[in-house]
């Protein structure tokens, strides 16, 4: 019942928003709620690019295969946005130093100062080659 409700909600969002990219939890996430959301997103958003993000506390074996270069302002904006989650304040896995260090690590993988890293669940696109 609950999974069907999630699927229907996602289908309604798809119709309303017509997204080009969906961000969900990585397939490496072991939290059962996160797994359910990712699985239902894969069903609801067929034909749309899906990228999985890392959750430090519940992702095991995550390695980013898609890296997006970001700058210092982006790092600060992400830290400020995450600070809005009051229920996570003070948690060891949810602090600005950890967030910044992950973005530095992903940046090193991309040979830049900072990057966001994603797991590729589905890429939909074209190479722009005309026949």
Describe the residue ranges of each PLM region:
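The feature marks non-catalytic terminal segments
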Residues: 16, 21, 55-131
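Histidine/lysine/aspartate-rich catalytic loop segments that bind and position anionic ligands
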Residues: 47-57
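Active-site beta-strand->loop->alpha-helix modules in alpha/beta enzyme cores, enriched
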Residues: 1-49, 98, 106-113, 128-130
